[in-house]
């Protein structure tokens, strides 16, 4: 029962499925015609130049029940697969390149399926032609044999080319390249090659012609563009010879020579003639027509001409022979002939070369002794040379030439006929130099000009030179630079200069001397050139560290040259630093340093660099000193006198320090000094006067003396000015009236209350002390009659101003020391420090070359010694 329940639903479903299957209809393609791009691909045409990968068609069909359909493409067995299809969309794509020339139709089986039924159709796709083929020549290569007597316009060959394209792309036309240079023409359609009208072929001029033929198709579409293809081939046209040209002599004109020693029967020359028809040449027969006069004969077959008489029997100097060359056919007939003229000259034998002669006969070596540098244009009269050629006419003509160092001498004459006297002339005097050549050697060459033998001969010429004093001694350098330490003992070597004179003997000996403003301390050895110091000389870099002077190199004839010597005296640490005073006193304001100074008289660093230090102080640890500048200041924690009072019980606030000045030389020198420092605080009294009073507080008479001296100078200046004005007016014989009155400006009460008993109130500028007013009563003489009242006496010189009044004060102001920053002035240096000048401050190792140029620039315009 259970199985029956399951069977009934299954049977029902099977019946429903059978009903549905029986009701299904097969799908089908749409037939849209030959020009349609969708359907079943029937009658589809594709150009062979369609690119691979192109979408060429769309399969399109439907199912009557409306079910979705799929598409397929299949091929016969062994066929190439040109297309692929998208099963769902039906898009057909070209996957293989088409070639109509190989396959012009493609069979494809297209199918459509709705999943239950499949419908297949076989369709043919036509491959359309595109112009993708070039013309091709057949039966190549083309070689044509053409007789040279072929008439113009005749056909000689037919050229054929094929193009596998159809239509205009397969049609071919022919033409020739370089048509203007060709002797041929071609029919454009048939390809028949002809000799151009009015043109003949000539084997003797050109045996082969190469004709380039171009075959071009009619053009057509290829991938959307019009394309025209062409091909070229070369036709070789060989011209065949025919007997149509007379013989030709080669090597004309013909010249022969019979010499005085020629034997009878000797061959003079050979003439050669060839048949003008080179392809099948005939034999040539030679004969002398006239001009021989029984003296010459010719070989009938070879063309060799021989003399049959002795040269002594020949009556003429020149013979003109007329020779005939005839073509002889194989049958023995003379078909053509030609003539040539042969010139034979009877000449003397060139059997004598040019020969050089001296005073005693033939000679091949000539010698001469002379001084160097003779004048240009001078003739070497010591050479007696004659040259001769015993032949006659052209055989006796030759050229002369000097072979050797060029441009020194020239020979006259250059061309000689038979005989001449040889003259050698100086051309370059400077090159005739004993120092370069002790002996000048040349070869005198004589060589024939117009003879085939070119006979020649040579003679050796040796010129021994004698020396003259033609050279100036020359230093090895234009300047010499030397260094020597100061304090070197007298007679110390400084530098050695060297000069050479290439002249020989005494002229080559050099003596040295020195002179110049800087040469006082130096001597030079006259032979060796060693420069050394005077025995008594003391070199001190602090006095002078630079010397320069000239050295002179002179030969025995007085010829000389100069060089400049630069000597630098190197500094040695030989001075100790020196303070300006052994015991110094300084007043120090709290917060302001005081400075000490010591001078080291050495010329160079580091010998003259001074370092300062405090050797001893009581109490210690109160002062600091700057090692380089010598500034002494209090420790940073000392800011008032109260702190100082706490340090020491000395209420005077005076300290004694032992300071040291030490140079940086090697070995080092040092100097010590005792310095007393009076410490005070800053007050309101400032300025130069306050500083002066502070310096002279212990010597009030000195202050009064200085003030009195200043006022006396002012009075003296006023009197001198007034006297000068008086004498000027007196010399002019009149005293001009004063038109402007100078009045003293009203002084205002000074607002300065500080140091009234020490200072004057000074205006801001000198012009504020006086004002100028015009005099109301002018003394001008309006009548111009010299009736002028006596001029008033000029005012007397103003008295010096009264001394300033002391400021009244009820309270006695406590004595305050103004701020004073003192420095020690160097004491007078006894070692000619002032003479040292600016040069002593320079570094002693300044470049000597730079100093040379500076000195030379400074001395420009002065005559050179």
From Swiss-Prot:
Single GO term (MF): calcium ion binding
Extracellular side: 24-705
Function description: Potential calcium-dependent cell-adhesion protein.
GO cellular component, one term: plasma membrane
Transmembrane residue ranges: 706-726
Segments for region (Disordered): 782-810
Keyword DNA-binding: no
Annotated keywords: Calcium, Cell adhesion, Membrane, Receptor, Repeat, Signal, Transmembrane, Transmembrane helix
Official protein name in the record: Cadherin-related family member 1
Keyword Metal-binding assigned: no
Subcellular location(s) of the protein: Membrane
């Amino acid at each position: 029962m259970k199985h029956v329940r399951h069977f009934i639903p299954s049977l029902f479903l099977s019946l429903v499925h059978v009903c549905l299957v029986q009701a299904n209809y097969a799908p089908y393609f749409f037939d849209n015609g030959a020009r349609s791009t969708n359907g079943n691909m029937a009658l589809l045409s594709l150009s062979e130049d369609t690119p691979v990968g192109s979408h060429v068609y769309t399969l399109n069909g439907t199912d009557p029940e409306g079910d979705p359909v799929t598409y397929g493409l299949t091929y016969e067995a062994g066929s190439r697969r040109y297309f692929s299809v998208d099963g769902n969309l039906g898009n057909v794509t070209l996957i293989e390149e088409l070639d109509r020339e190989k396959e012009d139709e493609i069979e494809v089986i297209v199918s459509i399926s709705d999943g239950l039924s499949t419908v297949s159709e076989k369709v043919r796709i036509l491959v359309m032609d595109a112009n993708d083929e070039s013309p091709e020549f057949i039966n190549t290569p083309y070689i044509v044999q053409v007789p040279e007597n072929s008439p113009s316009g005749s056909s000689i060959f037919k050229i054929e080319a094929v193009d596998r394209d159809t239509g205009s792309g397969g049609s071919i036309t022919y033409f020739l390249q370089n048509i203007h240079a060709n002797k041929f023409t071609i029919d454009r359609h048939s390809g028949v090659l002809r000799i151009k009208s009015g043109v003949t072929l000539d084997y003797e001029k050109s045996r082969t012609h190469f004709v380039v033929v171009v075959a071009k198709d009619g053009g057509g579409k290829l991938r959307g563009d019009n394309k025209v293809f062409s091909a070229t081939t070369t036709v070789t046209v060989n011209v065949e010879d025919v007997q149509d040209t007379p013989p030709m002599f080669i090597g004309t004109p013909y010249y022969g020579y019979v010499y005085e020693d020629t034997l009878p029967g000797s061959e003079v020359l050979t003439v050669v003639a060839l048949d003008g028809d080179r392809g099948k040449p005939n034999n040539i027969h030679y004969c002398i027509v006239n001009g021989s006069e029984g003296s010459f004969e010719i070989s009938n077959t070879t063309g060799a001409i021989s003399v049959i008489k002795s040269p002594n029997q020949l009556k003429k100097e020149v013979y003109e022979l007329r020779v005939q060359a005839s073509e002889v056919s194989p049958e023995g007939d003379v078909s053509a002939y030609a003539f040539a003229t042969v010139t034979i000259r009877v000449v003397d034998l060139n059997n004598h070369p040019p020969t050089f002669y001296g005073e005693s006969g033939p000679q091949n070596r000539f010698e001469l002794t002379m001084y160097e540098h003779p004048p240009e244009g001078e003739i070497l009269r010591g050479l007696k040379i004659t040259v001769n050629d015993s032949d006659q006419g052209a055989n006796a003509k030759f050229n002369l030439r000097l072979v050797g160092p060029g441009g020194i001498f020239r020979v006259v004459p250059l061309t000689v006929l038979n005989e001449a006297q040889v003259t050698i002339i100086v051309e370059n005097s400077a090159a005739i130099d004993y120092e370069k050549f002790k002996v000048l050697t040349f070869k005198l060459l004589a060589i024939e000009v117009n003879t085939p033998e070119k006979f020649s001969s040579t003679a050796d010429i040796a010129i021994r030179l004698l020396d003259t004093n033609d050279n100036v001694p020359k230093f090895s350098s234009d300047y010499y630079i030397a260094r020597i330490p100061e304090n070197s003992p007298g007679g110390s070597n400084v530098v050695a200069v060297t000069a050479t004179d290439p002249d020989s003997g005494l002229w080559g000996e050099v003596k040295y001397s020195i002179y110049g403003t800087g040469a006082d301390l130096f001597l030079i050895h006259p032979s060796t050139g060693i420069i050394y110091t005077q025995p008594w000389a003391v070199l001190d870099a602090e006095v002078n560290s630079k010397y320069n002077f000239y050295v002179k190199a002179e030969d025995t004839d007085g010829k000389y040259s100069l060089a400049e010597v630069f000597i630098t005296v190197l500094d040695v640490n030989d001075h100790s630093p020196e303070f300006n005073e052994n015991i110094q006193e300084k007043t120090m304001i709290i917060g302001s340093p005081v400075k000490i100074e010591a001078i080291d008289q050495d010329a160079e660093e580091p010998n003259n660099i001074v370092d300062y230090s405090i050797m001893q102080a009581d109490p210690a640890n109160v002062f600091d000193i700057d090692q380089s500048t010598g500034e002494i200041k209090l420790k940073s924690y000392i800011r008032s006198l109260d702190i100082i009072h706490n340090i020491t019980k000395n209420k005077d606030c005076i300290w004694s320090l032992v300071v040291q000045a030490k140079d940086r030389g090697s070995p080092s020198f040092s100097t010590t000094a005792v310095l007393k420092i009076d410490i005070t605080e800053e007050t309101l009294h400032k300025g130069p006067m306050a500083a002066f009073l502070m310096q002279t507080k212990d010597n009030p008479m000195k202050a009064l003396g200085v003030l009195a001296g200043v006022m006396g100078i002012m009075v003296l200046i006023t009197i001198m000015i007034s006297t000068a004005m008086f004498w000027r007016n007196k010399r002019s014989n009149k005293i001009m009236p004063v038109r402007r009155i100078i009045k003293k400006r009203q002084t205002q009460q000074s607002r300065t209350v500080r140091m009234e008993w020490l200072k004057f109130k000074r205006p801001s500028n000198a012009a504020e002390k006086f004002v100028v007013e015009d005099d109301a009563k002018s003394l001008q003489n309006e009548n111009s009659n010299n009736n002028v009242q006596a001029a008033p006496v000029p005012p007397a010189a103003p008295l010096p101003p009264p001394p300033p009044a002391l400021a009244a004060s009820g309270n006695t102001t406590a004595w305050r020391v103004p701020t004073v920053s003192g420095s020690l002035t160097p004491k007078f240096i006894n070692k000619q420090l002032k003479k040292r000048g600016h040069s002593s401050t320079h570094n002693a190792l300044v470049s000597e070359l730079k100093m040379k140029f500076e000195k030379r620039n400074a001395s420009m315009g002065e005559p050179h010694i």
